[in-house]
Curated annotation (Swiss-Prot):
Protein purpose: Component of the acetyl coenzyme A carboxylase (ACC) complex. First, biotin carboxylase catalyzes the carboxylation of biotin on its carrier protein (BCCP) and then the CO(2) group is transferred by the carboxyltransferase to acetyl-CoA to form malonyl-CoA.
Cysteines joined through disulfide linkages: none
Phylogenetic lineage: Bacteria, Pseudomonadati, Pseudomonadota, Betaproteobacteria, Nitrosomonadales
UniProt source species: Nitrosomonas europaea (strain ATCC 19718 / CIP 103999 / KCTC 2705 / NBRC 14298)
Subcellular location: Cytoplasm
EC code: 2.1.3.15
Protein name: Acetyl-coenzyme A carboxylase carboxyl transferase subunit alpha
Designated gene of the protein: accA
Length: 322
């Protein structure tokens, strides 16, 4: 798969293009230029490390939206077995922006729920660009209650620009659906692990992100609004998105400092899309550890900690001088 490079990766793209040219030349001639290829690969890797060591929040948001980044169903394919997708909210429709179902993780039955985006134009439209409508959140709610009924741990994958803001979604109760999920998830009598794998956009993300453990991939984002949306409100121009991204504190390290997430899952150099096996192994290992810890905690203690965590969002202290 040919890598799609972002605007700030132009230097890396040039190195990779030269490497591809040399590989093609070597395959079609008797010349041995492997040493030159290795030299360029070393330079490309060094430049990639240098660029990714000092990413701005705006650049991280671009990586979080990368079109080749692994989505929920990619994690399902690599980390779980015997996945059985469950469809529909039993009320209106089967929203394709939310996927979910039963699966096995290391032999243990779990319930999976996650946002799903599309790769090409047709699939993006089919998945509504990863923006769920009320029926998507109600489908998720149905699966949550099913998991609780059978005492099955819940794992959610968050990757959405936000809930769908269309008139039809509002008419069918978008805010009610999101609010109901928050209320129910706060009291679900099962362990819940939430993994932010790409964009964590506002209430559309939070509607499946109330849990006991919140994990976040290194180059993912989590925010009340997109940088572009914030810039449009504050400065009346999306051109200020980079400034907004800095102010919003959307990155994993900032959110960890504020106590809004528990752990940051490292990504390969260049982002998760550069090496699926590596990021899948990192996510698997972190999920294993998190699930084991949660299952050792008494249920009532787990529920109280979850509620305290949810009610603590937005609280902060100001140190005033004497």
């Amino acid at each position: 798969m040919k890598i799609v490079f972002l605007d700030f990766e132009k230097g890396i793209e040039e190195f990779e293009a030269k490497i591809e040219q040399l590989r093609f030349a070597q395959d079609n001639s008797a010349l041995d230029i492997s040493a030159e290829i290795a030299r360029l690969q070393t330079k490309s890797l060094g430049l990639t490390k240098s660029v990714y060591a000092k990413l701005t929040p705006w650049q991280i948001s671009q990586v979080a939206r990368h079109p080749q980044r692994p989505y929920t169903l990619d994690y399902v394919q690599h980390l779980f077995t015997d996945f059985e997708e469950l469809h529909g909210d039993r009320n209106f429709a089967d929203d394709q922006a939310i996927v979910g179902g039963l699966a096995r993780f290391n032999g243990q039955t779990v319930m999976i729920i996650g946002h799903q985006k599309g790769r090409d134009t047709k699939e993006k439209i089919h998945r509504n660009f990863g923006m769920p409508k009320p029926e998507g959140y109600r489908k998720a709610l149905r699966l949550m209650r099913l998991a609780e009924k059978f005492s099955i741990p819940l794992i959610t994958f968050i990757d959405t620009p936000g809930a769908y803001p269309g008139i039809d979604a509002e008419e069918r109760g978008q805010s009610e659906a999101i609010g109901k999920n928050l209320y129910v998830m706060a009291g679900l009598r099962i362990p819940i692990i939430c993994v932010i794998i790409g964009e964590g956009g506002s209430g559309g993300a939070l509607a499946i992100a109330v849990g006991d453990t919140s994990l976040m991939l290194q180059y993912s984002t989590y925010s009340v609004i997109s940088p572009e949306g914030c810039a449009s409100i504050l400065w009346k121009s999306a051109d200020k998105a980079s400034d907004a991204a800095e102010i919003l504190g959307i990155t994993a390290d900032r959110l960890k400092e504020m106590g809004l997430i528990d752990s940051i899952i490292p990504e390969p150099i260049g982002g998760a899309h550069r090496d699926y096996p590596v990021v899948m192994q990192s996510v698997k290992q972190t999920l294993q550890e998190s699930l084991r810890k949660l299952q050792d905690i008494p249920l009532e203690t787990l529920l109280q900690k979850r509620l305290d965590r949810l009610l603590g969002y937005g609280r902060f202290k100001i140190n005033q001088p004497d």
